[in-house]
Amino acid sequence: MTDLGDPKIDLTRFFKESSVHEINGRKVDSKELINGVSMISMKINQDNVDSVKHFTTEGLSKEDRLSYVQNIKDALNSDVFEMSTCNRVLFVGFGVDSKQLESALLEIGSVDSAPFEHRNGLDVWRHLVKVCSGLDSFIIGELQVMSQFRGSVALHRQYGLLSDINSSFFDHVISANRIIRREFGF
């Protein structure tokens, strides 16, 4: 686990250090935090077009989007992040698993099922890095998704939809994105 391929990054010091840190006077276990992150998402294709349209916030006013995310947050009693682009919709939950997140979305959306992809823990971070760096875009390396991601993070922070601790998760996605874009020359 210390060698994850190119670029060669030595991660051994991270495995030796304590996973418990103090943030704003509160002890926080980083392993517990990352294991408590979940995501449900859909990338548009011919089989899920109607579902993506149903759950997207593209085209909603800022007030309607904020209300939608707040309703999800209230239903879960947990922080939630939402991002919609022209070809995907994704929701990240904190302190809930992906099944709970999906259940809340289905109930709020008044539908019985939707073809969400589920991710939990570190896989959420990995997928967000892949999406934001443009590696999962129709045009490899495009910058638009990163811009949309930053805008969505800023909106969630500005309106208190994410705590400081949970919003810092997205700072790590942005940092990793910079490294990937530099390594691949995007």
Feature map (PLM): residue ranges:
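A glycine-rich (often HGG/GG-containing) alpha/beta subdomain
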Residues: 2, 9-20, 25, 29-137
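Glycine/serine-rich phosphate-binding loop and adjoining beta1-alpha1 elements at the start
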Residues: 114-186
